[in-house]
Regions:
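Conserved ATP-binding TGD loop and adjacent catalytic N/P-domain core of P-type ATPases
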Residues: 8, 29, 426, 436, ...
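Flexible metal-binding regulatory segments at protein termini and peripheral loops
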Residues: 1-121, 237-245, 334, 338-346, ...
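Membrane-water interface of transmembrane alpha-helices in multipass transporters/channels
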Residues: 119-126, 154-158, 178-198, 353, ...
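Transmembrane helix-loop-helix hairpins at the membrane interface
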Residues: 75-230, 356, 626
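Conserved catalytic phosphorylation-site environment of P-type ATPases
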Residues: 390, 400-465, 529, 548, ...
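Soluble-to-membrane junctions at the N-terminal ends of transmembrane alpha-helices
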Residues: 66-86, 123, 143-166, 337-369, ...
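Conserved cytosolic catalytic loops of P-type ATPases
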Residues: 17-40, 44, 189-192, 222-330, ...
């Protein structure tokens, strides 16, 4: 996919197929998320339909997507380097820096010699430009032809049309320029260098863009890097003279549920399972496992026989044996990776508006280019024909729907990836976009704001003795303070009596609270706040929170809560540290700010540059116009700058 027009076309095609309930296509990640009925339509059917529409659909199970992307980037880089070689040679010949000594063989007349030398240089430039078009620019013409067959157009269509016009006009001038223009006293030129440089700059831009986009997906690669390739399988064959069993290094894909696996200190646990045996120098019957990448907890967790362990976590001290419980795509790590991938591939509401604009963008640019050509030609006559053609070509080249298409998804990919690194799992892009709007947060007390306390704590407040087995979670007070400093009103919901609820609210620094709360009361409060015009986030961890979670504008669940709550929630906090709440809001605000920055740049670029390429300043007597060559450089820069700007979120 070359631009947002492509992703919009693919999405539109998928949504039109019978059996597909919903489809979302991301330009930045080049992925499609499809909810479909396999009884009505198969993956092969989708593949065929997308192929008929002019695009290639790669089914992840067929072959390695990463390998395909690597191979495509290698080809892109090779064509870019070749295009630069053609561009340098073309510039040298067109500028007269290389003559191959042909002037020595020309006839003695100075004018005729100059004419023949120029004609020879033009012919060499023609061959170089043709080779560049056929090899380096092949993808643009193939894509443009496919789009034409389906009555659509994309960024490749603009590149193909502009370079073809420049090449054909230059070819005509090479053989007939003196006869047609020279005889009428009209100065003529060839523009092979422009057609070559357009392709060179566009390919260079795409190379830089792909490298930058690859950086936006670093969080996924980091998560995938937590999955080991092999596992140490405990066989049923005993070691001679001992009661222990032999072990065999096997690919992780061969592990079955129930298999016994040994993991030593520093190695990654390959699958989810239950510890059957553990030992370390500190504790003879336990090992210590680093779960920071999953739960965010900095202190290694002690694991004894009967405890659960998760794929991707690492025994920092000791070794353990475990029985495989969940394998492959069913592990917690695989679920996290899948959730992040789906979130990065989902679309924010603003992106759907941009996609609609992109569908009319290319036809609109083509119309502007035609109008530009006609105005120059009608005002200047035949003498202005070269200028009219160059102006139209510059308009076609400088227009950039790519920047518009990349503005939102690249920022979302980085933002969602950054959140995952902080143990904040975002289920869809709309949640990240909406989170910055919230001005009210409803939070459940038990299990969310507080955790069980093993010791009975007698607390005296206002001559009231409270016996409690709970304590505030670490940093709960600071988290509530930061939320309220951001203008978010916090409402605590508790099933406790008034006195206890008041105590916990005061201790956490929360001004609003409700006591003796029933499950329906949480939903009622969310509805009441929404009726008051507030954007409400709900944070909970239990089954009795699901109704309120489903109703809230943004729903958040604690990762150690129930699966039901996490399924309903749009955002899951894997850590018990409530500072993740203000951190999520802060990240949402920065991501949305970055999206609007990108969109502003993408639109303002087109609004300013298209008239400049058309020569609008000549109306005011200013002799300045962007040439096709520089138009291609600016177009490439606009796309790359949007992606690089999104990458600044990594520093947030």
């Amino acid at each position: 996919m070359a631009c947002s027009v492509c992703s919009a076309n693919v999405e539109k095609k998928l949504q039109s197929l019978e059996g597909i309930n919903s489809a979302s296509v991301s330009l930045a990640s080049r992925t499609a998320l499809v909810d479909y009925n396999p009884d009505i339509i198969s993956l092969e059917d989708m593949k065929r339909e997308i192929s008929n529409a002019g695009y290639d659909l790669v089914i992840e199970n067929d072959r390695s997507v990463e390998e395909i992307n690597r191979r495509e980037f290698t080809l892109l880089r090779r064509r870019t380097l070749a295009s630069w070689l053609f561009a340098i040679l073309t510039m040298c010949f067109s500028m007269g820096w290389i003559s191959l000594g042909m002037e020595q063989n020309m006839i003695s007349d100075g004018v005729a010699s100059a004419h023949h030398s120029s004609s020879f240089a033009n012919q060499i430039c023609l061959l170089l430009a043709l080779a560049n078009l056929l090899y380096c620019g092949k993808q643009f013409y193939v894509s443009a032809w496919k789009q034409l067959l389906h009555h659509t157009a994309n960024m490749d269509s603009l590149v193909a049309l502009s370079t073809l016009i420049a090449f054909l006009f230059s070819t005509f001038n090479t053989f007939f320029g003196e006869m047609v223009w020279g005889a009428r006293g009209i100065e003529w030129h060839t523009y092979f260098d422009a057609s070559v440089m357009i392709i060179t700059f566009v390919l260079t831009g795409r190379c830089l863009e792909e490298k930058a986009k690859d950086s936006t997906a670093s969080s996924i690669r980091q998560l995938m890097g937590m999955q080991p390739k092999t596992a140490r399988l405990v066989t049923y064959e005993k070691i001679e003279g001992t009661n222990d069993y032999k072990m065999e290094e096997v690919p992780i894909s061969t592990i079955q549920i129930g298999d016994m696996i040994e993991v030593r200190a520093g190695e990654k646990i390959p699958v989810d399972g239950v510890v059957t045996q553990a030992e370390s120098f500190m504790t003879p019957d336990a090992a210590y496992v680093d779960e920071a990448m999953i739960s965010g907890e900095p202190t290694p967790a002690m694991k004894k026989a009967g405890d659960n362990v998760l794929a991707g976590t690492i025994p920092s001290q000791g070794k353990l044996r475990m029985r495989a419980k969940q394998i492959g795509e069913n592990t917690a790590l695989a679920h996290i990776i899948r959730m992040v991938q789906e979130a990065q591939g989902s679309k924010a509401p603003v992106q759907r508006i941009v996609d609609k604009a992109a569908l009319i963008f290319v036809p609109a640019v083509a119309a502007i280019a035609l109008i530009t050509f006609l105005i120059w030609w009608l005002i200047g006559g035949n003498a202005a024909l070269p200028q009219a053609i160059l102006s139209a070509v510059a308009v076609l080249v400088i227009a950039c729907p790519c920047a518009m298409g990349l503005a939102t998804p690249t920022a979302l990919m980085v933002g969602i990836g950054k959140a995952a690194q902080k143990q904040i799992l975002i289920k869809d892009a709309s949640a990240l976009e909406n989170l910055h709007k919230i001005n009210a947060l409803v939070i459940d007390k038990t299990g969310t704001l507080t955790i069980p306390n093993q010791n009975i704590d007698f607390t005296k407040q206002e001559d009231l003795d409270l016996e409690t087995r709970e304590t505030l979670k670490p940093h709960a007070q600071e988290a509530m303070k930061q939320l309220q400093e951001r203008g978010i009103e916090v409402y605590m919901m508790s099933g406790d009596k008034e006195e206890a609820a008041h105590y916990w609210a005061e201790k956490a620094g929360i001004k609003h609270y409700q006591s003796k709360v029933l499950p329906g009361d949480k939903q009622a409060l969310v509805k009441k706040l929404q009726n008051e015009g507030k954007q409400v986030a709900m944070v909970g961890d239990g089954i009795n929170d699901t109704q309120a979670l489903a109703l809230a504008n943004v729903s958040m669940a604690i990762g150690k809560g129930t699966d039901v709550a996490m399924d309903v929630a749009q955002i899951t906090l894997m850590s018990d540290d409530l500072l993740a709440l203000p951190e999520a809001v802060k990240l949402s605000q920065k991501t949305v700010h970055m999206i609007w920055q990108n969109l502003f740049w993408a639109f303002i670029y087109n609004i300013i540059c298209i008239p400049l390429a058309a020569g609008a300043l000549h109306i005011f007597g200013i002799d300045f116009q962007i040439t096709p060559m520089w138009a291609s450089a600016l177009m490439a820069f606009s796309s790359v700058s949007v992606v690089l700007n999104s990458l600044r979120l990594k520093l947030a």
